[in-house]
A protein has these predicted regions:
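N-terminal secretory signal peptides that target proteins for export/translocation
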Residues: 1-11
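Carbohydrate-active catalytic/glycan-binding domains of CAZyme proteins
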Residues: 34-353
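Bacterial N-terminal signal peptides
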Residues: 18-28
Length: 353
């Protein structure tokens, strides 16, 4: 049966329509004609993939195809890893504690948003933490482990990522592009009126940045300033000649949503003029689907090694049990990403997983 779906995205400066997406369903498999648009196959993902893990991050090992999962622990007190070679097995996998918060000083509270990266033949975990004496003095820190298995060996503390302005900062993510490694993070600026903006700089080591710092985005759009003025939780996906950066905005309740930045892959990423920003969120709450406050995502690929997946957290109810931070039920979920004829990701926010 031929299905024609017209998907209009009021983004890319609010001036374009992504166009018609054509797909054929045959024996339950989704295919595409003439390579007009990239479609994901119908995947048997058992959502949620992990319960009570906000800020989910997945690293897929290229040699084995197995998944390493990490996310924010509900008590904000430790960092855990779990691994499985099937996405649906992550919820059953043993969760191994590989690091615990300090009992005094820094790295002693609000252990948030750990990300697992592998480069320089070393595993790195980037995370945010507050001090025991001042839990809201949030800064960014790095752990390292040279063991082939990140669940084994010793995780060493490399220290804090220092930024030119010493202020509330979190959600560090790193990526390499054209021989350069970059860091994107969220940070507060006392001279501004927002809670956090997204900044970027080149890195000269796994724990330090160099050169100028550029502001990729500040929370200025209406959807980004609901409850709090926030841009945070960046994730990078390089596809189809573009560098895409998703991010999250607003308060961490049902108003939380995802936006999109992009730049041409051949452009100078440190030039702000080369970056573009969606005018509307690309993924947001949908009460009819029972999805509330989706965001702080990462990307991986399905077990076929080809299909891009969006990994994100959300709640399945509106009324919180306490505050957005004390309510533990932000569950990790996965869904395929579609690609339009212009090489942009289509998230189908109005459709379920």
């Amino acid at each position: 049966m031929l299905i024609i779906q017209s998907y209009h995205l009021a983004q890319r400066k609010g001036l374009y329509t992504a166009g018609l997406l054509l797909s054929y369903w045959f024996f339950g498999m989704l295919a595409h004609a003439e390579s007009l648009v990239s479609f994901a196959p119908r995947l048997n993902i058992d959502n949620p993939i992990v319960l009570q893990r906000a800020d989910p991050w997945i690293y897929r090992e290229p040699q084995t195809g197995c998944y390493q999962f990490i996310g924010t622990s509900p008590l904000f007190d430790q960092i855990e890893l779990r691994s499985a070679c099937r996405l649906n097995d992550l919820k059953l996998a043993e969760s191994k504690v590989i690091w615990k918060k300090h009992q005094k000083g820094n790295m002693g509270a609000h252990i948030w948003a750990p990300e697992l990266h592998y480069f320089n033949q070393t595993w790195y975990i980037y995370f945010a933490a507050g001090d025991v004496e001042d839990p809201w003095r949030i800064r960014m820190y790095v752990l390292a482990n040279s063991n082939a298995d990140p669940a084994q060996g010793e995780w060493q503390e490399l220290g804090q990522i220092k930024t030119p302005v010493d202020s509330f900062s979190l959600d560090a993510t790193t990526f390499e592009h054209k021989g350069k490694r970059y860091l994107i993070w969220a940070q507060m600026d006392a001279a501004r009126t927002y809670n956090s903006a997204l900044l970027m700089a080149e890195m000269d080591s796994p724990v330090s940045i160099r050169g100028p710092v550029v502001t990729l985005t500040e929370p200025t759009l209406d959807w980004e300033i609901q409850g709090y003025k926030v841009n945070e939780g960046a994730a990078v996906l390089i596809r189809h000649g573009k560098v895409f950066v998703t991010y999250s905005g607003a308060a961490t309740d049902h108003r939380y949503a995802m936006g999109l930045l992009w730049a041409d892959a051949d452009s100078d990423l440190m030039e702000v003029k080369n970056w573009h920003k969606s005018a509307k969120p690309v993924f947001a709450t949908d009460a009819e689907l029972g999805r509330y406050g989706p965001g702080h995502n990462s990307f991986t690929v399905a077990e076929d090694g080809v299909t891009d997946l969006l990994i994100y957290h959300s709640r399945d109810y509106l009324e919180l049990k306490g505050s957005p931070l004390s309510d533990p039920n932000r569950h990790a979920r996965a869904r395929p990403i579609y690609w339009d004829v212009q090489g942009f990701p289509v998230f189908f926010s109005d459709q379920g997983d």
